[in-house]
């Protein structure tokens, strides 16, 4: 082998493996308005320079492969390569970097969250050069978000359908989540709605098990719903879980729900998958059903601080795929979630335009243009004494879900529901009068409970 070839090989190739940095690390790249931008938290293996690790992430999630192939010459790679625009060290963390990657819009299929994720978080998370990798945030440009229909209805249309304004909505997950017969399940639904809640909810595990088949559950819940509506004069809903083993079965359940005339169905969007979720969202939009989204399995993806994908990414994807409600953490209950980043999720779900704010974990300014908002649902270990805090944290456009907080009431389900409704109305009224809920909250609830 001539010495000339040897030197050439050592520049660009090591045993056939490309030095990704040459093609993909472009610190002088100016991002375009149509690029999808990603912020990755990269933890390189010892000895791997950050720039190389960042470029590896960019390469594997776009056009790269481990060697040079002759078909590269048959296309214009520069047009379609993702570019790692910048890598900045994370303050206070050793060996962690935030890598910013820009993806040209042409890399993605329109209207497909599935394709977007397959590209951006597909193979790259198993990469040898990285000890850990976390997708912290995505900026979805209007040019791409406009190819999605988004939520079937959105916040305003939901309020109009339910005729409920000026306060958060109240929900309750029926417990025990598994084991009740359809008749007893329907009875619990009726008692909660009759007591004053707006919604009750199937737990995410309730699909169609031997002790309660889905059709039986749907029928008893619809009966409970109509009875409670007739007695209270308010519109009521029960999230009927349409999640099933196949897309066809799921749509069949949604059709049955529509035939019963109920207002809302539910889907587990991470276990069910984005493709199924988008299909169901389109069906709900066409047929006037609201769609509640449960995020079962999210902690598998977002719990690790240095690996996985942050929940704000999964939430943005849901807003594009379609859903009218999604559980977004509580700040005060039994599940993990700090106040600032939870409020960040909530704004990304509800607002039209969200400014970049690193203190809340928002890496990019996100402009949703006119895509409808998603109502965040606070659920998980909250009870009536959390009401002042919840009213203050979430504001009016939220659903507050008390499972054990309703059904665990010593006097029974209906009084539990009454307690929640009374506390909510008292807190909203006090807030509107300008009282400080953080200071006087418990006193306000005690006062209200005297007369209810």
Swiss-Prot record:
Substrate binds at residues 123, 173, 177, 295, 327, 379. One of its GO terms (molecular function) is ribulose-bisphosphate carboxylase activity. The record marks 334 as: Transition state stabilizer. The modification N-acetylproline is found at residue 3. The keyword Chloroplast applies. Mg(2+) binds at residues 201, 203-204. One of its GO terms (cellular component) is chloroplast. It holds the Pfam family RuBisCO_large. Its EC number is 4.1.1.39. Residues 1-2 form a propeptide. The active site is at residues 175, 294. It is found in: Plastid, Chloroplast. Its cofactor is Mg(2+). The disulfide bond which can form in the large chain dimeric partners within the hexadecamer appears to be associated with oxidative stress and protein turnover. The modification N6,N6,N6-trimethyllysine is found at residue 14. One of its GO terms (biological process) is reductive pentose-phosphate cycle. Keywords: Acetylation, Calvin cycle, Carbon dioxide fixation, Chloroplast, Disulfide bond, Lyase, Magnesium, Metal-binding, Methylation, Monooxygenase, Oxidoreductase, Photorespiration, Photosynthesis, Plastid. Signal peptide: none annotated. Binds 1 Mg(2+) ion per subunit. Belongs to the RuBisCO large chain family. Type I subfamily. NCBIfam families: PRK04208.1 (NF003252). The basic functional RuBisCO is composed of a large chain homodimer in a 'head-to-tail' conformation. In form I RuBisCO this homodimer is arranged in a barrel-like tetramer with the small subunits forming a tetrameric 'cap' on each end of the 'barrel'. PANTHER family: RIBULOSE BISPHOSPHATE CARBOXYLASE, RIBULOSE BISPHOSPHATE CARBOXYLASE LARGE CHAIN. This is Ribulose bisphosphate carboxylase large chain. It comes from Salvadora persica.
């Amino acid at each position: 082998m001539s010495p000339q070839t040897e030197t050439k090989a050592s520049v660009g190739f090591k045993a056939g493996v490309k030095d990704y940095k040459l093609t993909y690390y472009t610190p002088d790249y100016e991002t375009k308005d149509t690029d999808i931008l990603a912020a990755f938290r990269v933890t390189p293996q010892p000895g791997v320079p950050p720039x190389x690790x960042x470029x590896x992430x960019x390469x594997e999630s776009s056009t790269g492969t481990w060697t040079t192939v002759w078909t590269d010459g048959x296309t214009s790679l520069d047009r379609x390569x993702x570019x790692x625009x910048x890598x900045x060290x994370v303050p206070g963390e050793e060996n962690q970097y935030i890598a910013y990657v820009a993806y040209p819009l042409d890399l993605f299929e329109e209207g497909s969250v599935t394709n977007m994720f397959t590209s951006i978080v597909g193979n790259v998370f198993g990469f040898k050069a990285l000890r850990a990798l976390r997708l912290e945030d995505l900026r979805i440009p209007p040019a791409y978000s406009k190819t999605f229909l988004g939520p079937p209805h959105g916040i305003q249309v939901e309020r109009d359908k339910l005729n409920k304004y000026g306060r958060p909505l109240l929900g309750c997950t029926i417990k025990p989540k598994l084991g009740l017969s359809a008749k007893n399940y329907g009875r619990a639904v009726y008692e909660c709605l009759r007591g004053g809640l707006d919604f009750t909810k199937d737990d995410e595990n309730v699909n169609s098990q031997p002790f309660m088949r889905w059709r039986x559950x749907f029928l008893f819940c619809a009966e409970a719903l109509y009875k409670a509506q007739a007695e209270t004069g308010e519109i009521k809903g029960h999230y009927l879980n349409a999640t099933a083993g196949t897309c066809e079965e799921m749509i069949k359940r949604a059709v049955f729900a529509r035939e019963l005339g109920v207002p809302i169905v539910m889907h587990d969007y991470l276990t069910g998958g984005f493709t199924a979720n988008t299909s169901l969202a389109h069906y709900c939009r066409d047929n006037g059903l609201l769609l509640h989204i449960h995020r079962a399995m999210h902690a598998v993806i977002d719990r690790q601080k240095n690996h996985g994908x942050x929940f704000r990414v999964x939430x943005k994807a849901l807003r594009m795929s379609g859903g009218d409600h999604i559980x977004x953490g509580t700040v005060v209950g039994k599940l993990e979630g700090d106040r600032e980043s939870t409020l960040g999720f909530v704004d990304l779900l509800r607002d039209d335009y969200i400014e970049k704010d690193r203190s809340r974990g928002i890496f990019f300014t996100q402009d949703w243009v006119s895509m409808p908002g998603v109502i965040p649902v606070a659920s998980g270990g909250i009870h009536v004494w959390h009401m002042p805090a919840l009213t203050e944290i979430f504001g009016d456009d939220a659903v507050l879900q008390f499972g054990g907080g309703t059904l665990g009431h010593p006097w029974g389900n209906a009084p539990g529901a009454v307690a929640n409704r009374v506390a909510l109305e008292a807190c909203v009224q006090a807030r509107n009068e300008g009282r400080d809920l953080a200071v006087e909250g418990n006193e306000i609830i005690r006062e209200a409970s005297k007369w209810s």
